[in-house]
Amino acid sequence: MARYIGATCRLCRREGMKLFLKGDRCYTDKCAFARRSYAPGQHGQGRKKLSNYGVQLREKQKARRIYGILEAQFRKYYEKAETMRGITGENLLKLLEMRLDNVVYKLGFGSSRAEARQLVTHGHFLVNGKKVDIISYQVSAGDVISVREKSRGTEKFKTFAENPKTLPAWLEGNIENFEGKVIAEPTRADIDVPVNETLIVELYSK
């Protein structure tokens, strides 16, 4: 699968805000954005006023970067969201939130979405008792996500279990048993990403 391999901190600087792509590092003074919050490049400190199209494009890019998705796949999510009942923008965010890599991250098994993606790819997780290593796998309400038995003894997963996260309302965690459950589909109020999905819909509707 194609993926972005450039400097992660440049993405935060490009969007003009912390996207928390490096997990715990983003909360320290080692964070590149804390030291240089202007855009990368020779003219980065002289930000120009964006056109309406530019604002819409930046919002879409921000969403892509938060969830670690390339353009072609992001477009497919949008097209699927259009066919679903309800509000297209909210449907789009719901599809992104219910990716397995994001759910693993939200459950606290990963300090960032990037780390969660890596752990899923390496086969550390089960969905309803079966190994799933596809990061884009769409979970459903009622699904149980658990850490494989042989992975639970590693220092990384012990650390996750000892430092549980506050979970969103649509997830339920059982850290002692290294598992979590999707108890409902997320509502817009449950999704805390700093994205204005209406701008993305406006961009793709042109």
Swiss-Prot record:
Output the PROSITE patterns linked to this UniProt entry.
RIBOSOMAL_S4 (PS00632), S4 (PS50889)
User: One GO cellular component from the entry?
Assistant: small ribosomal subunit
Instruction: Write down the CDD domains for this protein, in alphabetical order.
Output: S4 (cd00165)
Q: Which InterPro entries match?
A: Ribosomal_uS4 (IPR022801), Ribosomal_uS4_bac-type (IPR005709), Ribosomal_uS4_CS (IPR018079), Ribosomal_uS4_N (IPR001912), S4_RNA-bd (IPR002942), S4_RNA-bd_sf (IPR036986)
- Taxonomically, which superkingdom? Bacteria
Keyword field: Ribonucleoprotein, Ribosomal protein, RNA-binding, rRNA-binding
* Pfam family name, one: S4
Keyword match Ribosomal protein = yes
What molecular function terms (GO) are annotated for this protein?
rRNA binding; structural constituent of ribosome
The UniProt record lists the S4 RNA-binding domain at: 98-164
A Gene Ontology biological process annotation? ribosomal small subunit biogenesis
Q: What role does it play?
A: One of the primary rRNA binding proteins, it binds directly to 16S rRNA where it nucleates assembly of the body of the 30S subunit.
Subunit annotation: Part of the 30S ribosomal subunit. Contacts protein S5. The interaction surface between S4 and S5 is involved in control of translational fidelity.
- What family classification does the UniProt entry report for this protein? Belongs to the universal ribosomal protein uS4 family.
Identification of the protein by name: Small ribosomal subunit protein uS4A
Q: Say which species the protein is native to.
A: Clostridium novyi (strain NT)
Q: Which gene encodes it?
A: rpsD1
